[in-house]
Amino acid sequence: MEEREESSSHEHLKEKLRELEEEWTAMKTGKNSSAVSWITVEDALEYVENSPRNLMLSLQHKPKAEMIQEISPLRRKLFHDSDDDDQTKKTTLLSHSSCWSSNVTSSSDTTKAKKKTTIRRFVSVTMVLLLSWVLVVLMNHFDHLSMNTQIITLVPT
């Protein structure tokens, strides 16, 4: 039963490959396609043809410097970098990326913002409580004053 499933999936993959090859030859012979797009598509197909497992195995066994040398021109083409010096090989892959911007907030920035908001909340609650206490004290004080004046005026003669 497993052999039938494997053979049917294998045949399905072969059929897909044939369809892709036919489409590829049709693209190559087409009048509207240019040589530049052919090169780009050929490079893309070269990467697609490698299975993910083979790609991962090759990445595990290659030295890091060799990987950066291979990836660097592709990354430059992707992000339209114009620098061709050796500094890009020594730096990280994200250092020259246009996706990496200064707008990204670090975790320390978010913790500082949280501290500011908690301090602001604390200060505002404290001010409200303090003002309400002052209001209560003033109201009680005025009540006592008014009571005292009434008592003084009500003293018998």
From Swiss-Prot:
Q: Has keyword Mitochondrion?
A: no
Record key words, sorted: Membrane, Nucleus, Transmembrane, Transmembrane helix
The KASH domain extends over: 104-157
**Topology in membrane:** Single-pass membrane protein
Localisation per UniProt entry: Nucleus membrane
GO CC annotations, alphabetized: nuclear envelope; nuclear membrane
Transmembrane feature ranges: 122-142
Q: How does it assemble?
A: Interacts with SUN1 and SUN2.
Domain remark text: The KASH domain, which contains a transmembrane domain, mediates the nuclear envelope targeting and is involved in the binding to the SUN proteins.
What is the recorded name of this protein? Protein SINE4
